[in-house]
């Protein structure tokens, strides 16, 4: 053994003695280096994310204009986690969560952990406590813009508090990022949009809360309404464009288009028809849609209704789309065992 190798072995032993077993290792020693995921609740978004859903143990930022569907996107993720037997928490800093709507999206409101904190510090401390417990699979913070520092709440209305919120977020994310990774929790931060004053060239839009969240996020999603979906003169929902602006786990800049229907959320039937047609799994002839020998209906809305009534055909098409894109969710079910193993390693 060379002197260099002996010195390295001694250093590794010293690190493990001081910081615990598993604090340093060769990457090849890790049994499973794949990124495990949880479905987003939208097949089109799973495809755009490139790995079949949200990566576990990472920070996700979802931002966009008002009423674009940001909270809907987050609630669908919560519903997916709960469906797989996981635990979800919603930190409602805006005090605006509609439990009736959440239930319609498939959220089990009886089991959902809900906090409506008074200050930004309180919200982030609650988030940290939940993450460090290792027992929560997803934490949603709605929204970063509503995380008001305690000093601002206790101060007078006209007082200046420059950079307070940015400092709060920066400090919180420094503490949270390691704990989120270790506990394999998905942390979704919903954010709003602001206009930068005096920008002549380039994009004047920015997100509140400073730059820290942009850096710490593994995935950033921009949610925008594209057009209204009408039936006659009645507006039934919006076609919404979700752009993957940043992605550390797959190629970025992919876009997903989904139908967000009022009172229903993301239309799974709509995206299956769109993706199926794109891949020629669903055939379109004129205005008629068909799958193999089965006619789905004339016009997109009729085809959507057919799939809603015939779940078996919908699942068959969905399976073919997932197979084509190689999407495989190895999500929540084995999380408890993984976290337990890591804790034993540390001990």
From Swiss-Prot:
**Chief location of this protein?**
cytoplasm
| Annotated GO MF terms | ATP binding; ATP hydrolysis activity; ATP-dependent DNA damage sensor activity; damaged DNA binding; single-stranded DNA binding
Q: Where does the record place it?
A: Cytoplasm
GO CC, sorted alphabetically, is: cytosol
**Keywords in alphabetical order:** ATP-binding, Cytoplasm, DNA damage, DNA recombination, DNA repair, DNA-binding, Nucleotide-binding, SOS response
The UniProt record gives the binding positions of ATP as 64-71
Gene3D superfamilies xref list: P-loop containing nucleotide triphosphate hydrolases
Q: Which domain of life is it from?
A: Bacteria
Record GO biological process: DNA recombination; DNA repair; SOS response
Which residues are connected by disulfide bridges in this protein? none
What functional role does this protein have? Answer: Can catalyze the hydrolysis of ATP in the presence of single-stranded DNA, the ATP-dependent uptake of single-stranded DNA by duplex DNA, and the ATP-dependent hybridization of homologous single-stranded DNAs. It interacts with LexA causing its activation and leading to its autocatalytic cleavage.
Q: Which family does it belong to?
A: Belongs to the RecA family.
According to UniProt, the name of this protein is Protein RecA
């Amino acid at each position: 053994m060379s002197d260099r190798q002996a010195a390295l072995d001694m250093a590794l032993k010293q690190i493990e003695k001081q910081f615990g077993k598993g604090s340093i290792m060769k990457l090849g020693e890790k049994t499973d280096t794949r990124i495990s995921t949880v479905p987003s609740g939208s097949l089109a978004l799973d495809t755009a994310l490139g790995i079949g859903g949200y990566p576990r143990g990472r920070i996700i930022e979802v931002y966009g204009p008002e009423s674009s569907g940001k909270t809907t996107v987050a609630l669908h993720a919560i519903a997916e986690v709960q469906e797989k037997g996981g635990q979800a928490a919603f930190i409602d800093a805006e005090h605006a969560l509609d439990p009736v709507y959440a239930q319609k999206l498939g959220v089990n409101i009886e089991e959902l952990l809900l906090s409506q904190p008074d200050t930004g510090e309180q919200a982030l401390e609650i988030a940290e406590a939940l993450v460090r417990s290792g027992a929560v699979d997803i934490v949603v913070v709605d929204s970063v813009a509503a995380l008001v520092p305690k000093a601002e709440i206790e101060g007078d209305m006209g007082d200046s508090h420059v950079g307070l919120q940015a400092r709060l977020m920066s400090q919180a994310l420094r503490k949270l990022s390691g704990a989120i990774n270790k506990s394999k929790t998905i942390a979704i931060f919903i954010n709003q949009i602001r206009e930068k004053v005096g920008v002549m060239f380039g994009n004047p839009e920015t997100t509140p809360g400073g730059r820290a969240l942009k850096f710490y996020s593994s995935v950033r999603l921009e949610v925008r309404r594209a057009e209204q979906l009408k039936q006659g003169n009645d507006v039934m929902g919006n076609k919404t464009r979700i752009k993957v602006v940043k992605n550390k786990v797959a190629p970025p800049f992919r876009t997903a288009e989904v139908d967000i229907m009022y009172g229903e959320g993301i239309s799974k039937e709509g995206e299956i028809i769109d993706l199926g047609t794109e891949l020629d799994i669903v055939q379109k002839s004129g205005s008629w849609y068909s799958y193999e020998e089965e006619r789905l209906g004339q016009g997109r809305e009729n085809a959507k209704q057919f799939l809603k009534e015939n779940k078996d055909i919908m699942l068959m098409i969905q399976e073919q789309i997932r197979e084509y894109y190689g999407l495989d969710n190895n999500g929540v079910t084995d999380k408890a065992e993984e976290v337990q193993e890591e804790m034993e390693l540390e001990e």
